[in-house]
């Protein structure tokens, strides 16, 4: 039972492999009507690029969750973008530079231009899927971060939002 009073069996079944082992019986019976997805996968954000392939997301799709295909497409695009040197700053957020194991200049976070592109594609994905993928509160925090990191006009985020969604953000000046 979770802290919120819900049954954890379903969540457990999502991260279970299709062949349950003996040790899982301690947790309890897995509902066979639930979709067992995969073990040994990431736990966390669906768009995490720390692993090359999101097996959990793929298995949801393989088991009939077709509505998740656009999320996989976006995530795979993010993985490709992350590997694109031009999309990344050569400095880390703390201003330092480093060399990787091959002796090449390492990469820091996405450039502001790359982040603008990512936001634009994410907002388009929201429209395509009907899922809320980013909240107004998160957008406001990003807007402030972008101002601190080089968007001195403080227009980039609100302009992208209006361009894609066709509506204004609550804090946007008219």
Model regions and ranges:
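Nucleotide-activated chemistry modules centered on ATP-dependent adenylation/adenylyltransferase
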Residues: 1-141, 164, 171-174
């Amino acid at each position: 039972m979770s802290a919120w009073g819900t049954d954890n069996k379903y969540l457990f079944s999502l991260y279970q492999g299709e062949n349950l082992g003996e040790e899982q019986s301690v947790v309890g019976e897995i509902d066979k009507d639930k979709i067992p997805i995969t073990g040994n996968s990431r736990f966390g954000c669906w768009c995490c690029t720390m692993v090359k392939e999101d097996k959990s997301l793929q298995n949801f799709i393989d088991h009939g969750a077709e509505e998740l295909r656009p999320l996989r497409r976006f995530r795979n695009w993010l993985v490709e973008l992350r590997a694109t040197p031009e999309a990344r700053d050569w400095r880390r957020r703390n201003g330092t530079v480093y060399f990787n194991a091959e002796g090449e200049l390492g990469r820091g976070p996405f450039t502001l231009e790359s982040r603008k592109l990512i936001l634009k594609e994410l907002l388009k994905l929201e429209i395509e899927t009907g899922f809320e993928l980013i909240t107004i509160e998160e957008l406001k925090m990003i807007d402030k971060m972008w101002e601190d990191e080089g968007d001195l006009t403080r227009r980039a985020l609100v302009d992208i939002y209006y361009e894609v969604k066709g509506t204004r953000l609550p804090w946007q000046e008219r």
